[in-house]
Amino acid sequence: MGSTRDRLLPPMPVNVLWGWLGPLLVAVFGGILRFVNLGRPHAVVFDETYYIKDAYALLHYGVERASLGTTEDPIADRMLLSGNTDFLVKCTPPDADPCPLYVAHPPLGKWMIGVGEQIFGLNPYGWRFAAAVVGVLSILILARVARRMTRSTLLGCLAGLLLSVEGLHLVLSRTALLDIFLMFWVLAGFACLVADRDWARGRLVTWYESSPLSDQGPGLGLRPWRIAAGLCLGAACAVKWSGIFFLIGFAVMSLLWDAGARRAVGLREPYRGAFGKDLTSILLAMGLLPAFVYVVSWAGWFASPLGWGRNWAQATSQGPAFFVFDSIRSWLSYHMQVLGFHTGLASTHPYQSEPWSWPLLLRPVAFFYETPATKCGADSCSQAVLGVGTPVIWYGGLVALLTMIVWYVATRDWRAGAVLASYAFGWLPWFYYAISDNRTMYLFYAITMTPFMILALTLTAGLIIGRADAAPNRRALGAAVVGAFTLLALINLGWLYPVLVAEVIPHSQWWTRMLFRSWA
């Protein structure tokens, strides 16, 4: 029976202290990169112009509110950079046009940005604080989930280290955009499901060892890690709607894991067992619970008369039952308009790119660029924030993803399948919008793919190093190859670092860091 347990549930590394201390040290390193000079540049960077003001309005009104100025003349941006927070449009009555603001994304990511603004004030450090926190936490989570998937603390720390020095993750961890929060909740949901996989297999093996076999096996009861995954993925959808691709994909993947576990213990009807015994729990945990989280994220809109499309006077014109009915009707109408906006978003932008070009880093987004008068030892200086990944990691990641395809075809290893599927959930849906709608898209949308690309690199590193019982010379050579790659990634990040974090450097040095003309 022990062999069945070991086969279904390989033992975790025995050193629990290093299992936490190693990932924490890697996260601290990533935190230093993200928090040092977090308030630089002292400017409103790219789409921060929307989310930092929305976050401020949510803190004070519970809903987003219109601000002074336009895209061409951002009066509000200049006011808040000077410390003036009186930048919201005032209306009498307060729910009259144009004060209610139409927004295209759910509120949760902006509420998270608002936490930093509440603690540190409405300044660049304050509005970027939450992004940096979740960036560091995602390093820790990735290190821990990689450790669980590989049963190796060393490989877990490698995954965290690679995410620490991944350029796009670094930039988004230092910028108040929504995508870093989306990535965080997606990764957290994935980590919970991997933990649930182990938990469920442990329950199944215990049943197998102590009960007579049946064709389908038992129901596995309340599954806390699956519930946690539902909460996280509901939060992902409450940041951006693209979280739903992961919610659906992960739910199917988790159900297939259940069927695989039942097959592995020798049940004759594993799929009927999984669908018959586990489908209800997955619908609750990955269906109703995420929907509940999503609706709750709109609590400010439901509770305030000031939200766009709220129709408060109409909703309160009759009794409580009509209030609930009319509020839901207005909320759904709002969502239909947002859906129309997203499907028809085809305006051109100088930094837009197609999803098939993202893995090659062909067109990054210049979040910020100035030619400051500050002396930098040259006649012309540059200060830039370029939203681009670390090329060594991304191009190495392509090789690793191809390795995962070969590995999965050859062995059906669940880890390769999970990484490939998760990467696809963050990438392939955008092909539809690019082809059918010609939708405006950007490289930084690929941030949700990045943790799974790094997991592919980590699993490939494990294959290169070899099993613990492999010949010492073979493992030493593999470790040297992996170490050399990691060193190259560190050097590559160090080379790019000035144009990722807005250091003032000579223009010639900025230009040498533009790997392709399309980067400039």
What residue ranges belong to the model's regions?
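Start-transfer (signal-anchor) and selected internal transmembrane alpha helices
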Residues: 1-33, 277-290, 420, 475-484
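Interfacial juxtamembrane loops and adjacent helix segments
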Residues: 50-120, 124, 207-218, 367-385
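Aromatic-rich transmembrane-lumenal/periplasmic boundary elements in polytopic membrane proteins
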Residues: 35, 39-83, 279-282, 286, ...
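Short acidic/glycine- and proline-prone juxtamembrane loop motifs at membrane-interface regions
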Residues: 44-45, 131, 171-181, 239-242
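Membrane-interface transmembrane helices that cradle and orient dolichyl/undecaprenyl
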Residues: 8, 17, 150, 189-225, ...
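Transmembrane-helix signature of polytopic, membrane-embedded enzymes
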Residues: 20, 25-26, 142-165, 184, ...
